[in-house]
Amino acid sequence: MVEKIWFDNHPLKYLLWPLLWPLSLLFGAISKSKRQQYQSGKKQAYKAPVPVVVVGNITAGGNGKTPVVVWLVEQLQQLGYKPGVVSRGYGAKAPQYPLVLDDNTPAKHCGDEPKLIYRRTAAPVAVDPVRANAVKALLETSVDIIITDDGLQHYALERDIEFVIVDGNRRFGNESLIPLGPLREGVERLSEVDFIITNGGQAQYGEMPMSLTPSKAINLKTKQQVEVSELRDLVAFAGIGHPPRFFNTLNAMNADVKVTKGFADHQDFDRQELQALAQQGANVIMTEKDAVKCDSYAQDNWWYLPVSAQFESNDAERILNRIKEVKATYGSPSA
C-alpha cells in the first residue's frame, strides 16, 4: 500500500497526508542536519587512502544498484585495478564486524547483495554497518579502489565519485520525502552527483541510459544453463525492491510463467514456504539475488536468471575515464 501512495497516486494519500507530511518534514530536517555536520566539519568523515566510488540512490527500494556495482568491478578488473566492495549488509547479522566474505560466508551473515557481488566478481567484499570499518578491513587485502554498494547518504565516509541509479519507469514517485514519498533526499541532490544512471524507461537530459540484460537461466544445483523460453510451467518469485520488474523481464523473454509471487526486499525466506510454492509448477525461477539465500536447499528444478548492466559505449568510456582521472590523483595504498 505504501508504494501505491508513493508511485501510483493512490487516493489514500489524501487521508494520510496530515499524518505523513509532518513526519516527512522531520525526516528531511534530520537528514539535512546530519549531512551539514559533516560538511561543516563538526563531525569528521573517514577519508580512505584510495578512491571511493559510491553507487546509491535517492529513493527507497531497489533501482538496480547491484548490477552497476558488478559492472564497475568487472570493468576495473579488466583495466588491471584491484577493486573491493563495501556494504552495510542490510538484512543480515554477522557474528562480528567487519566481516570480509569468503566462499563459505552464508547470505544470512553478509546479506544477499554482498554475497551476489562476491560470487559474480571474486573481488574482496566486506560488510559493516560502519562503512569506514569495512573499508579499513579491505585495505588489508591490498585493494586500490573502493566501491560502496548503496551508502549515498552515509556521509561518515568521504567519497570521490557518486552514482545515483534511477528507476526510469517509476522515477521519483510523488517526489516527497519518506514517509510521505519514496525520497531519501530531495531531487535537488541530483545536481551534485557525478553520474545519474537511468535503469529502463526514458533517460532525461543529463542522465545515462542503462539496461539490465538477462542471460540464460542457471540451475541452482547443477549450474546447467538453458534458455528461459525452454523451461515450462514456471513458478516465478522475487524478493527484490520491485518484484514486478523481474516478472516483466520474464514476460519479455516469452517465459512460460504460471505463478508469480513477490516478497519483500532482503526477506529471509522460509524454506517450507518456498518448497510449497514450488509445487505449483514444473520449474521454479528466481532472481540471482534470491538464489544466494536458498541454494543450500534448492531442488533439481530450481533456476535463477542473472542480469548484467549494459551501457552505451560512449557512456561507459566517460565513466571509466572519470575513475581513471580520480585514481591518478592517489598514490599506492602503501605509499
From Swiss-Prot:
Q: Could you tell me what reaction this enzyme catalyses?
A: a lipid A disaccharide + ATP = a lipid IVA + ADP + H(+)
**Has keyword ATP-binding?**
yes
List cellular component terms (GO): plasma membrane
Q: InterPro entries from the entry?
A: LpxK, P-loop_NTPase
Which positions does UniProt annotate for ATP binding? Answer: 59-66
Task: Give the EC number(s) listed in the UniProt record.
Answer: 2.7.1.130
Gene Ontology terms, MF aspect? ATP binding; tetraacyldisaccharide 4'-kinase activity
Pathway membership of this protein? Answer: Glycolipid biosynthesis; lipid IV(A) biosynthesis; lipid IV(A) from (3R)-3-hydroxytetradecanoyl-[acyl-carrier-protein] and UDP-N-acetyl-alpha-D-glucosamine: step 6/6
Question: Could you tell me the keywords of this UniProt record?
Answer: ATP-binding, Kinase, Lipid A biosynthesis, Lipid biosynthesis, Lipid metabolism, Nucleotide-binding, Transferase
Among Pfam families, the record links this protein to: LpxK
GO biological process, alphabetically ordered: lipid A biosynthetic process; lipopolysaccharide core region biosynthetic process
Which top EC class applies here? transferase
Job description of the protein: Transfers the gamma-phosphate of ATP to the 4'-position of a tetraacyldisaccharide 1-phosphate intermediate (termed DS-1-P) to form tetraacyldisaccharide 1,4'-bis-phosphate (lipid IVA).
Concerning its family, UniProt says:
Belongs to the LpxK family.
For this entry, the protein name equals: Tetraacyldisaccharide 4'-kinase
- Which source organism? Vibrio campbellii (strain ATCC BAA-1116)
